[in-house]
């Protein structure tokens, strides 16, 4: 009989339970052909054994097949004929006891080639070496590319917008006023088309920084020779940028007393992202800056007050039409967020905290923003956390409290009888320069104090009426405060009574 083995080849007969066993050889001497495995006493390449004859094929170190044959002793031959595989070595053995020199007829073959058989081969070593070298070179090139690109960006001005001469969407000679008028007459009323906004953003040249706040920086820039203001938001203030852009592009939002919106864009420069909001430029700056350096007469005071409340009234008013405008509350009114134009009128800016009222669903649309308003201008219901956040009118009345404080700032700078007070912030004499919630809560909610009036106001009719107006704006009870429309009408009557044309 033949006993064949290649890898884990079963040798012998099977028992009833399926287990393979080696047959018990006959107790006689068996002669076998031997090659490369001949003992010293062999004659004519013949050896003798009481076990098995075998023939084996295996692969040498160079990968060539080598055939050997010989005798296996009875002891341990069962295990040897099973030929337990050796890792990374190709080998096959066949055994027999049928007759003398029976292994002449055995022709074992190498087991099929497996990928792992080449792990230690010289060809694989060369391939591995080449692969590692190529990958290392590519990695070095990528690192060098990234490094030089980073250094190139570092050498550029921090806030420069690439001047890509893309005139496809903006014909030469078109001014910003032309573009805005065209969008109002033929568009949706929600601002310039997005593609035009992006083109303007690409073509702006940044000139100088003119301001800095908690949200980012303000730059004066130029587009085709026209001055514009570019508000550059910190990446942490993306929610404010998104909200302000959204509010400015609300249908029918444009108004002479709301800061004129031009464009918004996100500029990626590799190592950082810049959020741009481009608006009209007003060289007088904020009302806060203007009042610090400028004194007023009755006409200029009323002009500042009337134009400011006109912008606020437009914000607060819902417009019903096929393309209507929702009512909007500012939520961060202060003199630093109102700008002064060349003609002495004001416009309201910084709408990053604004809240909208959706009348169709009776829903208050509050921005997902961690930023809060300015503590000095917060009304009592915000300071003591009693404001009803689900009632839009609560936000409107909170704005009116803040506006009353702004009127006080303006009126103090109006000259009467040759006397004028220096500019001061509201509650300057009652709280520190950077008050805490507790500071403001104690003064506004607990002690119920408000900014004091100079004695001279009582002898000047215009200032006396202004004092009465602001008192009704900052009343402790929100329901008792005047609306923006009522303040606007009152200021118009005051101007008319003094023959002042606004």
Swiss-Prot record:
Residues 149-502 are cytoplasmic. ATP binds at residues 210-218, 231. It catalyses: L-threonyl-[receptor-protein] + ATP = O-phospho-L-threonyl-[receptor-protein] + ADP + H(+); L-seryl-[receptor-protein] + ATP = O-phospho-L-seryl-[receptor-protein] + ADP + H(+). GO terms for molecular function: ATP binding; BMP binding; BMP receptor activity; metal ion binding; protein serine/threonine kinase activity; SMAD binding; transforming growth factor beta receptor activity, type I; transmembrane receptor protein serine/threonine kinase activity. One of its GO terms (biological process) is cell differentiation. SMART domains: GS (SM00467), S_TKc (SM00220). Disulfide bonds join 32-53, 34-38, 47-71, 81-95, 96-102. The active site is at residue 332. It is an enzyme of class 2 (transferase). It holds the Pfam family TGF_beta_GS. It comes from the Eukaryota. Residues 1-25 are annotated as: Disordered. Keywords: ATP-binding, Cell membrane, Chondrogenesis, Disease variant, Disulfide bond, Dwarfism, Kinase, Magnesium, Manganese, Membrane, Metal-binding, Nucleotide-binding, Receptor, Serine/threonine-protein kinase, Signal, Transferase, Transmembrane, Transmembrane helix. One of its GO terms (cellular component) is dendrite. Its EC number is 2.7.11.30. Interacts with high affinity with GDF5; positively regulates chondrocyte differentiation. Interacts with SCUBE3. Interacts with TSC22D1/TSC-22. Interacts with TGFBR3. It is linked to Acromesomelic dysplasia 3: A form of acromesomelic dysplasia, a skeletal disorder characterized by short stature, very short limbs and hand/foot malformations. The severity of limb abnormalities increases from proximal to distal with profoundly affected hands and feet showing brachydactyly and/or rudimentary fingers (knob-like fingers). AMD3 is an autosomal recessive form characterized by bilateral aplasia of the fibula, severe brachydactyly, and fusion of carpal and tarsal bones. On ligand binding, forms a receptor complex consisting of two type II and two type I transmembrane serine/threonine kinases. Type II receptors phosphorylate and activate type I receptors which autophosphorylate, then bind and activate SMAD transcriptional regulators. Receptor for BMP7/OP-1 and GDF5. Positively regulates chondrocyte differentiation through GDF5 interaction. This is Bone morphogenetic protein receptor type-1B. It comes from Homo sapiens (Human). The gene is BMPR1B.
């Amino acid at each position: 009989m033949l006993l064949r083995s290649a890898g884990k080849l079963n040798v012998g007969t099977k028992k009833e339970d399926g287990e393979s066993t080696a047959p018990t050889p006959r107790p006689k001497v068996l002669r076998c052909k031997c090659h490369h495995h001949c003992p010293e006493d062999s004659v004519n390449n013949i050896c003798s054994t009481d076990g098995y004859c075998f023939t084996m094929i295996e692969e040498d170190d160079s990968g060539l097949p080598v055939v050997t044959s010989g005798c296996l002793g009875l002891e341990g031959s069962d295990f040897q004929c099973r030929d337990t595989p050796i890792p990374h070595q190709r080998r096959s053995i066949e055994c027999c006891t049928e007759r003398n020199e029976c292994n002449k007829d055995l022709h074992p073959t190498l087991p099929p080639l497996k990928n792992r058989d080449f792990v230690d081969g010289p060809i694989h070593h060369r391939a591995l070496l080449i692969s590692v070298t190529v990958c290392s070179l590519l990695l070095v090139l990528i690192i060098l590319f990234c490094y030089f690109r980073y250094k190139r960006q570092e050498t550029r001005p921090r806030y420069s917008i690439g001047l890509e001469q893309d005139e496809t969407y903006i014909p030469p000679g078109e001014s910003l006023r032309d573009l805005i008028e065209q969008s109002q007459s033929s568009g949706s009323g929600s601002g310039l088309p997005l593609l035009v906004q992006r083109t303007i953003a690409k073509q702006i040249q940044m000139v100088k920084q003119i301001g800095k706040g908690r949200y980012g920086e303000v730059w004066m820039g130029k587009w085709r020779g026209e001055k514009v203001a570019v508000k550059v938001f910190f990446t942490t203030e993306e929610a404010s940028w998104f909200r302000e852009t959204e509010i400015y592009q609300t249908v029918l939002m444009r108004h002479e007393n709301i800061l004129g919106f031009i464009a918004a864009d996100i500029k990626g420069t590799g190592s950082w992202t810049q959020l741009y909001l481009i608006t009209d430029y007003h060289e007088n700056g904020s009302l806060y800056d203007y009042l610090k350096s400028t004194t007023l007469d009755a006409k200029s005071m009323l002009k500042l007050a009337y134009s400011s409340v006109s912008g606020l009234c437009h914000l607060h008013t819902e417009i019903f039409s096929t393309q209507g405008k929702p009512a909007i509350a500012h939520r961060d009114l202060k003199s630093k967020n109102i700008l002064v134009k060349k003609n002495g009128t004001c416009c309201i800016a910084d709408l990053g905290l604004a809240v909208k009222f959706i009348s169709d669903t009776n829903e208050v649309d509050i921005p997902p923003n961690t930023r809060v308003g300015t503590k000095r201008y917060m009304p009592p219901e915000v300071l003591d956390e009693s404001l009803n956040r689900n009632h839009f009118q609560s936000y409107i009345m909170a704005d009116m409290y803040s506006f009353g404080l702004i009127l006080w700032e303006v009126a103090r700078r109006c000259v009467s009888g040759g006397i004028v007070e220096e500019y001061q912030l509201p509650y300057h004499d009652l709280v520190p320069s950077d008050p805490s919630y507790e500071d403001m809560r104690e003064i506004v909610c607990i002690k119920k104090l408000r900014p004091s009036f100079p004695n001279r106001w009582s002898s000047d009719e215009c200032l006396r009426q202004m004092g009465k107006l602001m008192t009704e704006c900052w009343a402790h009870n929100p329901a008792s405060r005047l609306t923006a429309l009522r303040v606007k009408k009152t200021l118009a009557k005051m101007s008319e009574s003094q023959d002042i044309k606004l």
